[in-house]
């Protein structure tokens, strides 16, 4: 990724007054929860709920169940990217993440947050001295500013273009993503796999 330009979209781009909004969901690139183990524990379900406010801020709430009876670990490591490709001439869209909160009804949920050299925010969840051997549910919430790409160079629409889960090394048995907001959606699309070559089911309502 070095050597490419960066398109700074840190300023908020609101939804109010948009003629059309395209929602594009990607499920492989940078954002990747991993377990504290060589191989990630499989995920039984992963549900993501995103609410877009009028000022273009995305409020993310996600719940996932990890099965540590299959692969022992200490908890997930959420890797939240602060940039992704999509601009003109190889440029990156950049955005800000804030208000990260993680909880679990059954497992240790203390967090240790760092930022790597690529700018990804890494949130390590769990107790370093406790290994898990059962199924455990985790909930993570955070706010993303700058995900609305105005007049995207390819679609010429205002896009909510987001990598939902990233390069997750373990098995995900069920994944759902719901995006809601105050404006109509013109188009919706979803891709998964390496290089986003495999389409996944998507639908939209409101226009």
Predicted regions and their residues:
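Bacterial N-terminal signal peptides
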Residues: 19-31
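Bacterial N-terminal signal peptides that target proteins for export
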Residues: 4-21
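Residue-level marker of intrinsically disordered, low-complexity segments enriched
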Residues: 7, 21-23, 41, 46
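Charged, low-complexity surface segments at secondary-structure and domain boundaries
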Residues: 5, 25, 81-85
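Terminal, compositionally biased non-globular sequences in eukaryotic proteins
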Residues: 2-3, 8, 33-37
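Lumenal/extracellular ectodomains and adaptor appendage modules
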Residues: 32-207
């Amino acid at each position: 990724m070095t050597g490419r330009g960066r398109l700074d979209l840190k300023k908020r781009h609101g939804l109010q007054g948009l003629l059309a909004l395209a929602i594009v969901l990607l499920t492989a690139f940078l954002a990747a929860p991993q377990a504290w183990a060589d191989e990630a524990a499989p995920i039984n379900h992963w549900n993501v709920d995103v609410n877009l406010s009028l000022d273009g801020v995305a409020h993310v709430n996600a719940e996932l169940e990890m099965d540590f009876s299959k692969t022992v670990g200490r908890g997930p490591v959420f890797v939240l990217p602060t940039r992704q490709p999509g601009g003109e001439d190889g440029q990156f869209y950049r955005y800000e993440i804030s208000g990260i909160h993680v909880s679990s009804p059954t497992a240790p949920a203390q967090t240790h947050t760092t930022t790597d050299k690529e700018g990804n925010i890494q949130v390590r969840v769990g107790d370093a001295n406790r290994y898990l051997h059962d199924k455990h549910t985790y909930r993570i919430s955070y706010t993303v500013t700058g995900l609305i790409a105005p007049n995207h160079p390819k679609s010429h629409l205002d896009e909510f273009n987001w990598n939902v889960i990233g390069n997750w090394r373990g098995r995900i048995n069920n994944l759902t993503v719901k995006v809601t907001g105050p404006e109509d959606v013109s188009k919706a699309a979803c891709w998964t796999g390496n290089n986003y070559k495999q389409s996944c089911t998507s639908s939209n309502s409101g226009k």
